[in-house]
């Protein structure tokens, strides 16, 4: 994502340990005296995206100025979870292991590119500890594009499928979406739309993140210059502390302590019809 610094300390090419290496470490964990039978997170920052995105990447390196998944998946992308399923099964098969969880890092857009549902079904059935954390970040497609994220309809498609498979498995599980306020491009109107989306879905986030710049990222360039370095166009930036407070409050509109801020934001946006 454009606001993420992971590529700077892990590299742009996704690299993974072998199944044998992960299993060896998991086995060491099972031999610890306080091990209770649970392996709590199998997968790196991209969890299910374990290897290079395409054959070209393996020989020529990553593409300049092109993302593998956003705004739309590259036609050369190879989306295959079969090796990841093999890894999960290998860890599950270890003596003393009761359950293997995937806590976060799932790339839901990559999952939807896989023509097979095998991993999706296995994830829902075997590897969610009540809640799965994913990162749609926003619902405004204009903001999402500046973030380097897929359109919101991709998350909605994932969300629908996740809950459908959960019901088919006879389980009660939830999604915890990571959300961000005040990213470059996000206006008060954008935050109001996100609040309406949360209300529609009946979701009240316990935590939200207000954007802050991290060195070297495209989003940081937008924040300091007001220009998108990827196309040279001007970008609105919420730098005023009070406006950032308003945007953040809208994402947690249901909290009594945010009431006055939410009312002020709605008045500024001409949406007094939403004041309750």
Where would I find each of the regions flagged by the language model?
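Conserved S-adenosyl-L-methionine
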Residues: 15-28
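Catalytic cores of alpha/beta
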Residues: 118-119, 183-200
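Conserved, mostly hydrophobic/aromatic
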Residues: 22, 134, 208, 270
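Conserved SAM/AdoMet-binding glycine-rich loop
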Residues: 27-176, 180-184
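Radical SAM enzyme core and accessory elements
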Residues: 216-276
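Short, solvent-exposed turn/loop segments enriched in Gly/Ser/Thr/Pro and often Arg
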Residues: 43-45, 212-217
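Glycine-rich phosphate-binding active-site loops on the catalytic face of alpha/beta enzymes
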Residues: 203-214
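Canonical Radical SAM [4Fe-4S] cluster-binding loop centered on the CxxxCxxC motif
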Residues: 1-18
């Amino acid at each position: 994502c454009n606001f993420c610094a992971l590529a700077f300390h892990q590299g742009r090419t996704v690299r993974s340990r072998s199944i044998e290496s992960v299993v060896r470490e998991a086995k060491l964990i099972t031999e610890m005296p306080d091990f209770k039978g649970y392996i709590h997170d199998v997968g790196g920052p991209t969890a299910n995206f374990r290897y290079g995105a395409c054959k070209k990447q393996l020989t020529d390196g990553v593409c300049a100025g092109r993302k593998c998944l956003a705004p739309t998946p590259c036609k050369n992308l190879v989306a295959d979870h079969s090796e990841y399923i093999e890894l999960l099964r290998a860890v599950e098969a270890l003596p003393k292991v009761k359950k293997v969880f995937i806590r976060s890092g799932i790339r839901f857009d990559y999952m939807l590119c896989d023509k097979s549902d095998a991993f999706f079904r296995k994830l829902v059935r075997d590897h969610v500890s009540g809640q799965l954390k994913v990162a749609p970040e926003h619902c405004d497609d204009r903001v999402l594009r500046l973030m380097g994220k897929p359109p919101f309809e991709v998350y909605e498609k994932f969300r629908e499928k996740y809950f459908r498979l959960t019901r088919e498995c006879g389980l009660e599980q939830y999604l915890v979406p990571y959300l961000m306020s005040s990213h470059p491009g996000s206006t008060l109107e954008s935050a109001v739309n996100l609040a309406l989306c949360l209300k529609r879905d009946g979701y009240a986030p316990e935590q939200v993140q207000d954007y802050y710049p991290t060195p070297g990222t495209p989003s940081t360039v937008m924040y300091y210059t007001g220009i998108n370095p990827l196309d040279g166009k001007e970008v609105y930036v919420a730098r005023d502390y009070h406006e950032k407070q308003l945007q953040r409050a809208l994402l947690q509109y249901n909290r009594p302590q945010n009431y006055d801020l939410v009312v002020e934001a709605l008045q500024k946006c001409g949406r007094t019809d939403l004041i309750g």
